[in-house]
């Protein structure tokens, strides 16, 4: 009985938010644009752009870079992979772009971040688990 009063827009909006998060989570390691994502989700790029700004309070590129950086940070701390391999595997086009975006977000270089996180883990007795490769 109460379900009759739920507005279609709110349900559709929640569904689009879920599909947006799911899409980025499943594809951030690949190269794709807002336009491609909108096409794949069956919405206009303007609608999708509003989802990012209203729901996540950042634009598409910022949201995508956050997902990529989060993955890269895990790899930096838990693997011995090169920074180049990590940046490319995280979806960045180049190490130069990766370094710039990383420094903007964390105020340090990826190599320093790795050193500091490992040093902190060792000094606190929490040795990071070594992983050859995350999939």
Residue positions per predicted region:
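An amphipathic alpha-helical interaction segment
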Residues: 1-8, 12-19, 47
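Short linear motifs at secondary-structure transitions and domain/linker junctions
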Residues: 5-8, 37-39, 52
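Terminal helix-turn-helix DNA-binding modules in bacterial transcription factors
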Residues: 18-26, 31-36, 43, 53-95, ...
